[in-house]
């Protein structure tokens, strides 16, 4: 096998690790400790809003030499110093797509579970992503330094979730860690290196680069920027590059720390400037010295590019989304889809783009009331005047997914939904028709729901269609006059005002004005 690898030009490559788990279970703090840096500063609200990728170097225990830095070589991952690339994915459920894409590029996953909280919904979602990706994983039980930490409870919950840990009848490795004291961190890194060696990860440093786009954004100063994980070959400055249907040339190449470099190889995370358009997140990229010919995607002119929520809803809300990255755009679509289904609304997406809100966004807005979402973007100067001039435009801005969702729900309820003017009190099915009394209709029926009272108004419904309305002038039960009849009770009604003859099988819906 070793000779065959040499013939093919294959050498060992560092593993790519994805970290998954429930929100606030310590993923970013864990990586921050491992890197011994403060790169992972908290973003607004304490949620990491974008996938980041970081590379660390681990010196094999007992091989350190004072004053000497030991480096791994491309030809042998199993030297005294090993590189490991981490992908840090957000914990909020809205970023499920980004987590899923992160898992696909990874060789090993770390499932983070807090010792004081145990298995949560997003823990199970993360586990499902790992299993679907078919990659080995390690369970890191975090926050073991907390007084409320309960490792046995967590391990039992993991067993219930189908995770069979080592020494508990399974083969899933686990380790308790503390990002506060550093306990268990070395053991975790050793487990990663062990799993990587077992997988025998190989790549060819002489090939043109290929890999995955894990983030894409528009930098207002530098242009289209993409974060890439290289899975094979070598990427160089001035290489031609293509991802999906988007091509470009590597004009700027930086490592994960933002330092300019001339080349990078597997499994390095790099930042590239030079794509002609935003590179699609989750798409494979290819690079090389020869120009890559590609037909630019034709942007079709469509009034509605996507419909989210309840497709057959009577409440249909036109919507434009402007955000800072592709990842954010997808996350917003997830939230909008969920909000629509929860409330029975349909959101008609007219545009979903990365970039600031500008005058051009208003050219596609229909005459009816329309929502514009601005997520972590700015408004061009002319936008405020356009908003003032058009009362049908409603702008929702924010820096947090939660914030956008709450604002969106509140505004839709306030401005897009007609408030009910009536309250339904009860319903009666007509079971019998009697001779009229002084021109008023006399009927018998059963209260199907709610309750009805003497003097209540009602709608006469036939075949689910409102055909007339009237009023109760006398209500009886067992031939005795009463003030009300409740659900399940039989009653007799003398009604007036109905311009259509009431028939057996009709439905009377009783209401009052609000």
What are these regions (language model features)?
Residues 5, 198-215, 289-316, 408-430:
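Long, charged amphipathic helices and adjacent flexible linkers at domain junctions
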